Amino acid sequence: MAPDIQRVKAFLLDLQDRICQQLSAVDGDDFVEDAWQREGGGGGRSRVLRDGVVFEQAGVNFSHVHGDAMPASATAHRPELAGRSFEAMGVSLVVHPRNPYVPTSHANVRFFIAEKPGADPVWWFGGGFDLTPFYGFEEDAVHWHRTARDLCAPFGDDVYPRYKKWCDDYFYLKHRQEARGIGGLFFDDLNTPDFDTCFAFMQAVGDGYLNAYLPIVERRKTLPWGEREREFQLYRRGRYVEFNLVWDRGTLFGLQTGGRTESILMSMPPLVRWEYGYQPEENSPEAALYRDFLPVRDWVK
């Protein structure tokens, strides 16, 4: 079946609406929308909730851009795409909570299609979600990964382990030799067995994000915290910034295609700190993050 771009776009717009509505319901504050146009073609809706009770900053972005030539970041691992026009659309979000006991979360679902006259279109889906705790809780990690495993199950027994590994490998800071968080799912270049199956999987990932995240937020948002926890949260947020600016393909793609910089960098935490040579105290809750949660684990054995 030929790709149905309008069906994908309708799902993505609705997904953005639903995620914003549910995050607003948890926080009590509203998102502010910024509709924008891209000079080279296309545009989007950026929505940001700032200075909320639960969420210090949450950004949920929809974009649909098109152009006459694929950018270098997209053709580097797919050289056959050079010389094709393209359309790219997706929803991308990052939630930075206020309480250090609530983890940061990120999710993204996207669709690419590249075409040229006289040739079949090249298309694929990508996306996933991942969790970045500051203070780890076993039950939260298990719930997050169980939700991921269960949404993958209808698509095959090998889907969850494959996309979990891809997530573990992708969200890794090589210069720190350290995982960004506890992972989740990551997939890209998905175009088999057919459009409908791939689209259904992308929908399952998009719909599964809140099922994975909101129960964790509800469990942790009222835990008391102080300056020590806040300092560690801000320090660990530095890893988020490092990953996004140094390693993230989506950030590079957006900047190379002349994307909207404010929307691309919406994922950045509002406050962050670095500390030279930081080492957590032995046997502290901070040390437990490095010892028990950042190393790759099978959470749903």
From Swiss-Prot:
GO MF terms listed in the record are: coproporphyrinogen oxidase activity; metal ion binding; protein homodimerization activity
**UniProt keywords, alphabetically:** Cytoplasm, Heme biosynthesis, Metal-binding, Oxidoreductase, Porphyrin biosynthesis
Q: Which residue positions does UniProt flag as site: Important for dimerization?
A: 175
| Biological or metabolic pathway of the protein | Porphyrin-containing compound metabolism; protoporphyrin-IX biosynthesis; protoporphyrinogen-IX from coproporphyrinogen-III (O2 route): step 1/1
Note the superkingdom of the native organism.
Bacteria
Give the residues annotated as active site: 106 (proton donor)
- Biological-process GO terms, alphabetical: protoporphyrinogen IX biosynthetic process
Compartments annotated for it: namely: Cytoplasm
Under Pfam families, the record lists: Coprogen_oxidas
Enzyme class, broadest EC rank:
oxidoreductase
Q: Does the keyword Metal-binding apply?
A: yes
User: Which InterPro entries does this chain map to?
Assistant: Coprogen_oxidase_aer, Coprogen_oxidase_aer_sf, Coprogen_oxidase_CS
Q: Which GO terms describe its cellular component?
A: cytoplasm
Where this protein primarily resides, as one coarse class?
A: cytoplasm
* Cofactor dependence: a divalent metal cation
Stretch list, region Important for dimerization: 240-275
Residue positions annotated to bind a divalent metal cation are 96, 106, 145, 175
Catalyzes what?
A: coproporphyrinogen III + O2 + 2 H(+) = protoporphyrinogen IX + 2 CO2 + 2 H2O
Q: Name the residues that bind substrate.
A: 92, 108-110, 258-260
Q: What is its EC number?
A: 1.3.3.3
Q: Which family would the database say this protein is a member of? A: Belongs to the aerobic coproporphyrinogen-III oxidase family.
What is the recorded function of this protein according to its Swiss-Prot or TrEMBL entry?
Involved in the heme biosynthesis. Catalyzes the aerobic oxidative decarboxylation of propionate groups of rings A and B of coproporphyrinogen-III to yield the vinyl groups in protoporphyrinogen-IX.
Instruction: Identify the HAMAP family for this entry.
Output: Coprogen_oxidas
Oligomeric form and interacting partners: Homodimer.
Could you identify this protein by its name? Oxygen-dependent coproporphyrinogen-III oxidase
| Source taxonomy | Bacteria, Pseudomonadati, Pseudomonadota, Gammaproteobacteria, Enterobacterales
The gene it comes from is: hemF
